């Protein structure tokens, strides 16, 4: 169930939120990391850059431009509700627990996932 979208939510939020002055970069970080981590009971292991936290970091390239297309996304579907949307940024690097996982849109390390036990939600 659901719609494809998690792959592009950060770049959409940056393009149509931050770049258009609707939200700040700090708000974007809260929307995409801190608030979900608190909601799912994994904060402060996730959702913050601090000593003892996991160091999950996404670096955005604000100069990269692209167009969302079902032909190029990583979902196992043939459609995308954001088909044709223009993005004014791209994902440069993704670090999971401090390990480089994605570099310029390419997966460089597989199977970095780790089960995380949930606590009480904090939101």
Regions inferred by a protein language model and the residue ranges of each:
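Residue-level signal for well-ordered alpha-helical segments
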Residues: 5, 26-29, 36, 68-73, ...
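Short C-terminal domain-edge/linker segments immediately following a structured domain
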Residues: 7-15, 87-94, 123
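Generic alpha-helical secondary structure signal
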Residues: 18-20, 44, 79, 86, ...
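Short, solvent-exposed cationic patches
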Residues: 116-123
């Amino acid at each position: 169930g659901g719609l494809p979208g998690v792959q592009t939510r950060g770049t959409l939020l940056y393009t149509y939120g931050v770049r258009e002055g609707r939200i700040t970069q700090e708000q974007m970080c809260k929307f995409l990391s801190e608030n979900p981590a608190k909601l799912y009971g994994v904060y402060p292991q996730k959702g913050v850059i601090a000593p003892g936290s996991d160091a999950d970091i996404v670096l955005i390239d604000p100069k990269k431009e692209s167009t969302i297309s079902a032909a190029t996304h990583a979902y196992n579907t043939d459609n995308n509700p954001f088909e044709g949307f223009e993005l004014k940024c791209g994902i440069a690097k993704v670090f999971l627990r401090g390990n480089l996982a994605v570099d310029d849109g390419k997966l460089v390390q597989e199977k970095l996932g780790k089960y995380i036990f949930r606590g009480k939600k904090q939101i």
